[in-house]
């Protein structure tokens, strides 16, 4: 189980690829991976961005040894090699197939948590799955790395020069800070996710 391996600090590229190879069966349309951002998420696990910032200057890490190693691994996913990735460019007009995932033909699908609310929970209700039928796990750690590295999302809010609504801008920033820092607000938001969007204590 990937989550058990993660909790033990053993969820690595090699363990993930081992599972992927066991699961994948192209002749029966079974593929280990699907999703839009699979490549970027795996590259992030190297701990090196493709373009970095050093001493205030942009630098290319495209020739970094770990990124090259990751690219070599990703190349094996292709339909011309080990076929570990669902060939969405051939089968589904470049779109991930959530139906294939729901039918048990995809082992790992990379996506955002909001996709659960939009799509996956509906499959769960329709198929009457138990709470533990759907689970999330971080991307695996690069073998030999010192820790787990993941992509991050950063939001930025800019105040437009000449704007006449400075108070509204301040209120918006404050509301965002409050919702992300206040424990009571976070607890209420979590409960709303459970009540309205079918999240549960295991997700």
Pin down the residues of each PLM region:
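Stable alpha-helical elements in mature extracytoplasmic
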Residues: 12-19, 38-39, 67-74, 97, ...
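Extracytoplasmic/periplasmic solute-binding protein
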Residues: 9-60
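Glycine-centered hinge/linker elements that transmit conformational signals in sensory
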Residues: 13, 17-22, 53-92
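Loop/turn elements at helix/coil->beta-strand transitions in domains of secreted/extracellular proteins
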Residues: 24-31, 82, 103-107, 129-135, ...
